[in-house]
Structures are given as structure tokens and as C-alpha cells.
Amino acid sequence: MRFVLINIFTFLSLAFISQNDSITDTLKKKQKTVDLMEVIIYTPKDNSFGISRLKNVEGTAIYAGKKTEAIYVGDLNANLAANNSRQVFAKVAGINIFENDGSGSQIGIGGRGLNPNRISNFNTRQNGYDISADALGYPESYYTPPTEAIERIEILRGAASLQYGTQFGGMINYKFNDAPTNKIISGNFRQTGASFGFLNSFNQLAGSAGKISYNAFYQYKHYDGWRDNSTLNYHNAFGSVKYKVNSRLSIKGDYTFLNYISQQPGGLTDKQFRDDPYQVTRNRNWFKVNWNLYSVVVDYEINQRTKLNFIAFGLMAGRDALGHLGRPDRVDDTSKYRNLLSDVYNNYGSEIRLLRRYSFLNYQSNVLIGARAYKGSTVRKQGDADKTSRANFSFMNPNDPENSSYLFPSSNYAVFVENIFQFTKNWSITPGVRFENITTSSEGYYRLVNRDLAGNVLLDMRMPDNRSNSRSFVLAGIGTQYKIKTNYEFYANFSQNYRSINFNDMRVNNPNYQVDPNLKDETGFTADGGFRGVVKDLLYFDVSAFLLQYNNRIGTILTTDTLTYNVIRYRTNVSNSRNLGVEAFTEIDWIKLFSKESKHKFSTFVNFSFINAIYTGGQQPAFENKKVEYVPDMIVRTGITYAYKKFSVTGQYAYTSEQFSDATNAVSSSSAIYGIIPAYSVIDVSAGYSWKYFGVFAGVNNVTNSLYFTRRTEGYPGPGILPADPMNGYVTLQFKF
């Protein structure tokens, strides 16, 4: 199959590159028209609000007719040291956030009614390449790029499936700041102190000399936490070297290192949360992450009309979760062994893209063709660890773990084509198609233990479990946009989506949680349309509606364990679901409205989303018309910013309506692993001032000290309710040259 795909791509590439000179002649004859088309394309940053859209064509990617956002970090007042998602993503409509990690070591966001857990419903990238544990089998992101290093965060919704793969949520790309071309050396040193023993040191050097440019940073974090047993020690480093061979060819290599260890205080029951959200239920739970990312990027401008981009990337990483997974209403018996879940990831892949401009009906159009090859290998073990409270991530029997031992190999080969057909100066249509071949397998065993009511072992067997599933399919989509003048446009898109089952959906040993052994892949589509526009530094808006159809949706229901008779969460293909929603964002500078030359800025923004997400029938008709879990009906974020020269201050209010944590829509439970998540609201204030090489930034998050939670979990870092951070403050000192 891989040779067929490579041959298809090679044939298409050569066909486009070897076109005769008639296209060139046509372009020359229509040069005036082509120039006009270039003028109306948005600049990379069309306002100072910190939010924009992506251009129709960015490098070798096509975004015309798609719902996109670009967050410009440098324009934000936010707690960047802690990667505060509530502030960083405040202007992105429809984003639901897990807020249980005050250090920012991991973030969880979901869009349009998709689960926020570790951004697993987005294809997550850094500088254009994958960063998740396994893009197919385990698309969770244990590594979060430091916001202080980022130029912008690029977001593409469900239409991303054609260019970036099969995730329903779309694609998120963290694009780091480029090295300055006019300095041999530049530096950015930011030191942050905050509540609960939080320390963050971010140190960056970058520059250019001749044909070589470089960018490197090191970040250290320490966090004691607002609950006991929450200590974090965190090390993150990045290095990049780019060699510009000539004016048309460049080669860049990136390396990212991450290592951290954190203690986890465990989850709470509803009663424990009401009585004292500061209390802890665990002192033996720990979590460790080790991440190594590497990539090589080649950009080649073949001629004025043709660009080629090639990326090779790899991941060598691991994560270990250690502790006691029992219900939070049960005491951790320190006389018993702890449980260790250990993963080792070794993945590598490559992507190649060819973008060509050509004349169509006397207007400039663009065609993009690309291919992807990816191989993943995950070793997952679960078994007993020692009885202590130390961070000792070692199995008692490493060669024969008590619960399970698996190898999860995976592979993915794909080719895709998208084309912007520019029919008039203002109207374009962008169809696309993607062919996918996916193989996921499991090779290993799990241990089956049955006990009687007295706890005596009746059956203890080692069960071999070897499975393999290979499938090929085609995804198609089409988008359109129509411009009104230069700065306003209507857009609409329809794209098919697909999501394969992941490793967690195959086997996990957890007393609170079981998995259906007959799970099926998820399919569906995303349709959206809207109206957006910008008036530079005065007004930006984007109003849209969407429909997300999700078939064979995997979710959690409540059932009774046939052996223990305890109520547990059971992961299965619950049903089909339908997410229907409206997303709206607008920001206006009221001073610029009356005085365009004023140095003062006084802007307000409103970010609103309404989502109706219900199960609509399928494998489990009993859940028809039940609400989909982790989908609040309403999310509102609004804020106000005042700025004058190098000083700015922002106040922000965020409201999220209530949501359920499982497909049965249970309101409460004694174990707290399922139940309702009540509505909550939070206020944040941040300010900053810069003078020459120096800057000071400060703020208070959760100003009113709201006590709330956004997540219930059946496993680590719980199980149970995971409380959000109370009121906390921070101060950052910056030296930048």
C-alpha cells in the first residue's frame, strides 16, 4: 500500500511541475488580475486584538472557506507562565476547558462539544509536526508548548480532516517565535513568582548569522500546589537551527526535551468537595513524563508558482502513573501494593506538501497535494509497584507485570488533494479529498481474576489478547467563501471526519472503569458557515453556526460490574450524536471608533457559544435525547482592555453552564466518578508595562475565589472530582533585548 501511495504522489507532483509554459504565458497576460488577488488576501496579523483568522494560503496549507483562528500571544494580557487556558483561549468561541492544573504542565481543551481531556480531540502540533503520544492510537498531549515561546496558536476546526488527519475537533498548531534576522543574538528572560510556591524561569536566546539562524530556550517550573501532595518539578528545553541554502531552499532541525514529576493529591467526593475542597485523599500517587521530540523541515520554492514542504518527525517518550486507583470515598490501604501504569512511545513519520498557483478563469487559483506516512509503537504495562509513598516508578515484577503487558503498533498512510477554484474576484470554492489507510494492532496479555463475595480467588488466568485491524477509506469535503469588499466575507464548509479507537479503548485494569471489547471506529461529518470581518485595530468579528454529526460515538455509561456488583463506568459505542451550535466573537476599540490617531486603547470583547448536543439513537437507543457528556449548553467569556503606549490592563469574566460527565446524565454518585458538573463563573485580571529592555507583568486569577470544578475522572489524576484553583496571583519580571 505504501508504494502505491508514494507512486500516486510522485505522479501528481511531476504532473504539476512539468506543466507546459502555457500557464506561465497566461499568468503574464493576466498579471494585473493576479496582483489584485494578492492585494485582497489578509496580512498575517490584521489587528492588535490578539485574535485573527488564517490567510487563504499559509505556506503550503490551504484555509480558504474554513473556520480558523490565530491567537497572537504577544497581544494578550494573561498568565503566560502557567499557560492559563482560560485567558489564552478566551477569544476562541466554543472552547470548553479542564481547569485542574494550576501549573500549566498539561492543558485540556475541547471545541464544539468534544471532550477536553489532554486536547485528544484535536490533531495537536508544534511548528507543523505532531506532538501527541500517538497520533492514531493515543492522541493525548502530555507535553504543552510553553506559551512564553509562542508567536501564535493556529486553530482549524473540523475541516482540518482533509489536510491533517481524522480528528473531529480539528487541528491546533503552536507556532514558536522565529529567530530575528537582523540580530546575531537576542534574549528573552522571564522570571515569575506566584501563589502556592509557583516559580517559573523561562530563558531564551535567538539570532542569525549569515545563512544560519538559531532559537533555543530552557524553562524550569516548581509548584507546591494549593492542596497538599501536589508538588511539581518541571524541565523543558528546545533547540532549533535553520540553514538557508539559498533564497529558495532552507533546512531546519528542531529538538524538544521535557521531563517532569508531579505528586497527585487524588480526587474528592461531592461531600468532601462541599466540606473542604483543600483536603487530599492520596499521598502515594505520582506522575512522570519524559518527552523527546525531533524534526527536520525542508522548504523549497521550486519557482514563483510552486512551493514544496517536507517534514520528518519523531517521538521517543514515556509516561508513568503510579498510585492507588480506588474510589475517593475509600481509604488508601498503605499495606497494599500500588498500581503502576507505564507507557513507552516510539513514533516517527513524514509529510510532504506541494502547493502550486495557476490561472483559472483569469484568476489565481491554488492546488495542494500531499502525502503522509506514519508508524507508531507503544509498549504499555500495568502491574504492582512498592507500598511506599515515594516516587519509585518500578514494577515489582518488570518482566511479568500482574495486570497486563501490551505492544500497540500502528501505521498510517495517506494522500490528499485540495484546490481553491477562484471563480470571480470575490468568490471561490475549495473541494478536497483524502485517502487513508490505517492499521492498529495489539499484542500481549491481560490477567483475569475472579473472586467470591468474601474476596477469595476463584479464577486467576493470564489471557492472551492479540488483535489487528486494517482499514482504508476516503474522506471528502468542500468549502466556499464570498468576499464583500476587502475585509468582510461569508464562508461555509462541509467535511467528513473519522476517528479510530485508541489504546485506552482496548484494555485497562481499573476498578472504576471497564471497556467494551467490541468497540467500533467513529465516523461523521462537520458542517459550518459564518460571516467574519475586520477593520484594522477597530473591529474584529466572526459569527458562525455548525453541525457536528458523530456516529458510533464512544462514551461512558453506568453499569453494574457482574463480579463485584459495584456501579462502574463502562466505555462503549453509546450511540450516534448530534452537536448543533452557534459561535460568536466580536471585539471593538471604542476610542479608535472616534479617534483613529489616539494612542489610547479601550476595547471590549464578547465570546459566546450555544451548543445543543444530544444522543440521537444507534447502538444504545435508551440514551436517545440524553445530553452528550462534557458539553455545556452555554459558554460566555467577555472582557475589557485599556492600553496606553507600553501599559495595558485586561479584566475578563468567564461563565460555563452545567454539564454532565457521562451519557446517562447521572446527577450524583457516592463515588463521585460520575455526576453533574455545576455551572461556574470566574474573573481574571492581568496587567503589563514595558520600558526599554524591561517589563513587569502581574495579575490575579479567580479574583472572587470561586470554588468550582470542571472535571470528574475515573482514573488518574483522580479518581473523583478534581477541584479548580482558588484565587491566586502572579508577578513576572522580564528582560528582553
Locate predicted features.
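Face-selective signature of the C-terminal outer-membrane beta-barrel domain
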Residues: 247-258, 289-449, 483, 542-545, ...
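Short acidic/polar hinge/loop motifs at secondary-structure boundaries
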Residues: 129-157
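Extracytoplasmic beta-strand/coil segments of soluble accessory domains associated
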Residues: 58-60, 69-74, 78-129, 133
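C-terminal beta-signal and adjacent terminal beta-strands/loops
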Residues: 551, 601-604, 655-667, 688-737
